[in-house]
Design a protein with these regions (language model features):
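A short acidic (Asp/Glu
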Residues: 108-110, 194-204
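Extended hydrophobic secondary-structure segments that form protein cores and membrane-embedded regions
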Residues: 185-192
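A short acidic/basic microdomain associated with nuclease active sites
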Residues: 85-108, 112-115
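Catalytic cores of nucleic-acid endonucleases
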Residues: 127-185
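Active-site beta-strand-loop-beta-strand hairpin of nuclease catalytic cores
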Residues: 114-132
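Short secondary-structure boundary/capping segments
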Residues: 137-141, 201-209
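Interfaces and regulatory segments of ATP-dependent nucleotide/adenylate/phosphodiester-chemistry enzymes
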Residues: 1-89, 207, 215-295
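Well-ordered, non-membrane alpha-helical segments in soluble/globular domains
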Residues: 77, 159-170, 206-215
Length: 295
């Protein structure tokens, strides 16, 4: 019905469900639907806490505080490691969590390091969100500026994301690795913001990463691979394939890096899409997670 949208500006991210009739609803996009459920629940909690003054601030300010608390206490400290445990199933991996690394080597370490033979995976996890205002701006400079602030460095010069990984490779990895051996270093940035799934984001951040590395003093024994962005939700979706040894993380990353260089048009393809294709080919699309069965 053309008149339905007359005078309106429909936004399926804000309204991901379409009412067909009094008893039938159509989910327009499942990711927007689940995001809406999750964030609406947090905002409802924020509104109640703000109204009762259990947390000071407007509902919007309390919402930001709650999101930070959930990220710090649950997503970063528990969920990230739980999912990665199911992904890195090969017993040959030597794995250190961020807490273990900090206790043994002090500040400045990544959220996880996994070593398998001469392959070293450096994981940095970022539970950040781009605001609707930024995502809907349609302005390249606005979006890139926010990505830089969240995943490169803050306005005050504090390292974030790719810069943190570069710092680890230059200054901290030598503490874990023998000095007389050669290693392949795989920088991996794990995220939760679905907008980072889009073509070109990984390409842009890898260029920033390479630019940062070019001014650093990197150990000659380190062969630094391209940066790979990985969506935590997608790993969760296909974790059963990893647990069943149908997918192997290190092999998948190497295959993806080779795929990117095969053709020029592959250069901007995100790892998320590559993993979807491999997971579906193995028959694991939308199969229940091993984490769900365990918990």
């Amino acid at each position: 019905n053309d008149s339905y949208w007359e005078g309106s500006d429909p936004n399926i991210q804000e309204y991901p469900v379409f009412k067909v009739d009094s008893s039938t609803y159509c989910i327009l996009y499942i990711k927007f639907f689940t995001d809406k459920l999750f964030h609406s629940m947090i905002f409802d909690m924020a509104s109640i806490l703000s109204k009762k003054q259990q947390i000071k601030g407007t509902p919007g300010q309390v919402y930001v505080q709650l999101k930070q608390m959930i990220g710090q206490r649950f997503t970063e400290k528990y969920l990230f490691y739980l999912i990665m445990k199911g992904i890195l199933t090969d017993k040959r991996y030597q794995i250190w969590t961020g807490e273990q690394l900090k206790q043994s080597y002090g500040d400045g370490m990544p959220d996880m390091i996994a070593i398998k033979a001469q392959r070293v995976f450096v994981f940095e996890f970022k539970d950040v969100q781009l605001s609707a205002k930024v995502k809907e701006s349609g302005d390249f400079d606005t979006i890139i500026s926010k990505i830089n602030l969240e995943l490169v460095q803050t306005e005050k010069g504090k390292p974030k994301g790719v810069t943190q990984i570069a710092n680890v490779i230059e200054k901290r990895l030598e503490k874990l690795l023998p000095s007389n051996e050669k290693f392949k270093i795989y920088p991996v940035l794990v995220y939760t913001e679905s907008s980072f799934d889009l073509e070109g984001i990984n390409y842009y951040l890898n260029n920033k990463f390479r630019e940062i590395l070019s001014s650093r003093n990197i150990d000659d024994n380190f062969c630094i691979k391209d940066l790979v962005l990985v969506n935590l939700e997608t790993l969760f979706m296909f974790d059963r394939a990893f647990r069943d040894h149908k997918l192997k993380f290190d092999v998948l990353i190497n295959d993806f890096l080779s795929y990117k260089t095969n053709k020029i048009e592959h250069g901007s393809v995100p790892f998320n899409k590559f993993l979807f294709q491999r997971g579906k080919a193995k028959g694991y699309f939308y199969k229940s997670s091993g984490i769900v069965r365990e918990t």
